Regions:
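Charge-enriched amphipathic alpha-helical scaffolds
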Residues: 83-115
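Intrinsically disordered, low-complexity serine/threonine- and proline-rich regulatory segments
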Residues: 1-55
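Positively charged, polyanion-binding regions of nucleic-acid-associated proteins
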Residues: 40-87
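Detector for Asparagine
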Residues: 22-24, 35, 65-68, 83, ...
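Generic detector of intrinsically disordered, low-complexity, polar/charged segments
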Residues: 20-22, 72, 106
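A diffuse structural propensity rather than consistent per-protein peaks
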Residues: 1, 5, 67-72, 97
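Intrinsically disordered, low-complexity regions
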Residues: 24-26, 74, 110
Length: 118
C-alpha cells in the first residue's frame, strides 16, 4: 500500500495544476514546502489513517459516474468517523485525517476534479 500511496501523491503533484496533500488535505505548494512535507512524512504519520479510511470507504460510498458536489472531503471524513462504531466496531479509534481520506478514495479509484484554485 505504501507504494500505491506514493504513486497517488506523485500523480497529484504532476497534474496540470500541481496539487499537494498532507494530513490536513489539499494544501498550496508554498504551505507544503513551508511545512517540509514529503511522501515519507505522509506515510509515517498517515498510514494508519489511510488504512482505516480504505477499509470503510467501500462500505459507505457507492461509486457512480457522477461527481459529488454535495459533500466536501472534510464532511465525508466526519461521516466516516461517525459511522465506524456501527460498521467496523473493532476499530478502537475511529479518527482519520482529511488527507488520509482523500488518498484512500484515490486508491479505491474514485475520481477527482482538478480544483481551479487551492
Amino acid at each position: 500500500m505504501e507504494q500505491q500511496i506514493k504513486q497517488q501523491l506523485q500523480t497529484l503533484r504532476e497534474a496540470t495544476l500541481p496539487v499537494f496533500i498532507n494530513g490536513n488535505g489539499f494544501v498550496s505548494e508554498d504551505e507544503y514546502r513551508e511545512n517540509k512535507d514529503d511522501d515519507e512524512e505522509f506515510i509515517a504519520t498517515q498510514m494508519e489513517y489511510v488504512k482505516k479510511a480504505y477499509d470503510i470507504i467501500p462500505l459507505l460510498f457507492e461509486k457512480t459516474n457522477r461527481y459529488n458536489y454535495k459533500w466536501s472531503s472534510y464532511g465525508m471524513k466526519h461521516y466516516c468517523t461517525e459511522n465506524f462504531p456501527q460498521i467496523l466496531p473493532d476499530v478502537e479509534n475511529p479518527y482519520i485525517s482529511n488527507g488520509a481520506l482523500i488518498v484512500a478514495m484515490l486508491l479505491h479509484g474514485y475520481e477527482w476534479k482538478q480544483p481551479k484554485k487551492i
